[in-house]
């Protein structure tokens, strides 16, 4: 694959990192559409959980400009979220039986089928279909999308397709994109975990990437000591840790009625965003993060109405528009990068 020449790169270019957040992913879509409407060309997208759904579909659609901004919005608003709560078909006790049998309330098969179908409609089945032509990237990173997953068997964060060969001995080009997304959104105790068998026959249990890092905005940051050629914008729909679990999962707000529940609230909050909080507090990181107001939507509210989804979409669009109104790439480089990178930018982030 030949590296992209400078004249082939649009003047407004960015990589994106999309946080997890369950059904709040619609807010991510609103932010991405605002970037599209502003003229940005997105080169690569990293996603966690709900962000992995958005990221892979947008990466697939970007090949040949298959979806307009209006079509992206309508696709997000028409996701059959209610069907994604696919419990074992037993009246009344279905979710309970699923939890006892599989340590999860729901199977996740409906979500998997929908994701696989939408990707197929865009011509994407395996990661080889999302190859990215950039010779100045490490071979394992030459893909338009990457999803973050937690491997609880080996106790590590894995980024697929980047880590298929290193961790599992598998050819990334032959692995299913939909399978990786399904693993990234396997919220513990809500969706069944995903099992991946390595080339050596070892079985790993994969769950939601947000368990270890829900907003890895550093994913595309360069490791070779050279400056970035274009920015990486992060979009998050999860409140800061100071907002507590009530802002993240409103259905759990009654926990505050019990003094002894404070520790549980703090534990849940820390699991969702604590790993990333210190890094995100750094000024050179927070300045490139788009924060979408989503506190009135539970991350697991799969019965949410279309009206509320549209408001969440609008919040995302507004957040990105406000961000772009003050964003200055040259000023960012001068303030945070100039002292460290004396050479001109070369190659992707």
Q: How would you name each of these model-derived features?
A:
Residues 237-239, 259-349:
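C-terminal helical/tail subdomains of lipid-metabolizing enzymes
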Residues 1-11:
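Extreme N-terminal leader/targeting segments of oxidoreductases
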Residues 209-216, 230-239:
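Glycine-rich anion-binding loop/nest that anchors nucleotide
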Residues 41-44, 144, 229-232:
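Residues at the starts of beta-strands that form the adenosine-phosphate
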